[in-house]
């Protein structure tokens, strides 16, 4: 679980220090910065995918300038610190990305450590063999770092000036602490099922072998469902039964591979016709993806599940079901979501709500406190307090 996060200089987030709980629901006006917070986890995901992917993602997203608070003229770097707690221990990972030539980023600092152990590791380059090559290395506690694999004793400063995270290499060849942190960093899953256009991957055929995890845009939903049906029939049936609550005419999925590919199809009650994604409403497709995501077998769940406006296109009753599923899945994985739905907000406790507001161009994040609202909650729901601007989060 991600226990704490600090961010500086990322989009509208000039400076943020935030403790996180099993459920974290961001509410606020349009443009307040909710989606910027959510997009930070997508940024981290690309940063940890494989060498070259961070710069590819930055380039596709408009360049490094577009990620910096008020642009590179005002902000020169992005800084972040993440603190994790898991069954393997408590860990810390931090990095600093500096604006560089050609509208790109370079790492000016990157470090990690075990919070329960006084000795700390530091990210170092793969295949480094000379202190002259990498003159800036130190531990979190500023003590000398003994690089046993390199047989070097270094007392210099931090390593800097590289374009991709060194944690990618150390996640497979470094210390156990490095491996654990890399796995935690890789296990953020950000999902947004907004694209239901004619060219959306959700509506196309996909490989039957692309079934390990549900894709960010549910582009492999059919293959993922087929894998659950074959290996986890009990969970598959729960998915089908829940979709029937949202779409009463839904009977079952028709998951028939053809040439090692598969298309999302289903039948309805009272007919033998087979329906395809192009015949369904946007809300129905999103409901299928959300229910599958939230009811998948626990072993395939990510450590941190991130959702951006999951209520989009859903009937009010469907929103309440999704809220219940989020509460249930939070017992097995951490959930971070942004929403504009009063109905969804009412599915959660006050301490799970984070109000996001924009003041002087920067986003602020404030978690609600139950004790401060006890008198109000005797007469009003959370959504009513939101609409009345008692808790903030309105334009």
Annotated model-derived regions:
Residues 21-61, 110, 217, 287-293, ...:
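Phosphate-binding glycine-rich loops of NTP-binding sites
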Residues 212-277:
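Extended helical coiled-coil dimerization/tether regions that scaffold
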Residues 1-14:
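N-terminal pre-Walker A segment at the start of P-loop NTPase domains
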Residues 89-241:
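Electropositive, glycine-dotted interaction segments
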